[in-house]
Amino acid sequence: MTNNFMAPEAAAALLKAATADGRPIAPLRDRLAIADQDSAYAVQEINTRAWLAEGRRLVGRKIGLTSLAVQAQLGVDQPDFGMLFADMAVGDGEIVAAGRLIQPKVEAEVALILGRDLTQERHTYADLIRATEYALPSIEIVDSRIENWNIKFVDTVADNASSGLFVLGGRSVRLCDIDLTACAMEMKRGDEVVSRGNGRACLGSPLNAAIWLADVMVRCGRPLQAGDIVLTGALGPMVAVKSGERFDVSIEGLGNVSALFA
């Protein structure tokens, strides 16, 4: 390794510091000795272990890059995942304090709450449906520790899949009572509709994304467990956030959820 490149531990330290002090860093993809998927997840895992050792509580996972268009843009053929910690949760309608995030954007998603562990090497629809306690409407508030969102696959994976915060709606719905493939989504900023979509935008169905995640988590040695929250991926385009804005999301059959920014 030459002095021009850094080890995963050094990259993880840069991202961890950026998370703590709110100052973004330059992209990592040209600074890692080996800039591939395995290296990116190694960086993420280093910080996951560090945060767990510091007492942060792991409560679930998020799935990113579920749009085929975004995958093509980043030159990949699969989604990615990141960790959800308890201190990332924001109440429905709760104000997100200014300065808590660096360059936030919002996405409307279906959240699944698991009632059983998912530990099979390869899961089926039946496995997932049986394991899911209920679904909730959600807003993922994504963020990037990389300057100006100048990201490629390696950057976002290393940066915990560009995780920030998340908001869950308060109305739980059983999977038998909703069509997650056809459900329509509308997001408003104030009175203006800024994003529309449906379940098909998320790998054809949020359930497809969740099955992908369940299989990957078993291979990674961190299988999904009862009680975990799974943010299954965006149902429509993400929207940048400015101070003072309010976002209201409605997902057909699931209900509403809101995020407010100071």
From Swiss-Prot:
UniProt GO BP: 3-phenylpropionate catabolic process
Q: Which cofactor does the UniProt annotation name?
A: a divalent metal cation
The pathway to which it is assigned is: Aromatic compound metabolism; 3-phenylpropanoate degradation
Query: What's an example GO cellular component term for this entry?
Result: cytoplasm
| Single Gene Ontology MF annotation | manganese ion binding
Question: What top-level class of enzyme does the UniProt entry assign?
Answer: lyase
Report any Pfam family annotated for this entry: FAA_hydrolase
Catalytic reaction equation(s): (S)-4-hydroxy-2-oxopentanoate = (2Z)-2-hydroxypenta-2,4-dienoate + H2O
Q: Which UniProt keywords apply?
A: Aromatic hydrocarbons catabolism, Lyase
Q: What is its EC number?
A: 4.2.1.80
NCBIfam families, A to Z:
PRK11342.1
Give the protein's biological function: Catalyzes the conversion of 2-hydroxypentadienoic acid (enolic form of 2-oxopent-4-enoate) to 4-hydroxy-2-ketopentanoic acid.
Q: Which family does it belong to?
A: Belongs to the hydratase/decarboxylase family. MhpD subfamily.
Q: What is this protein called?
A: 2-keto-4-pentenoate hydratase 2
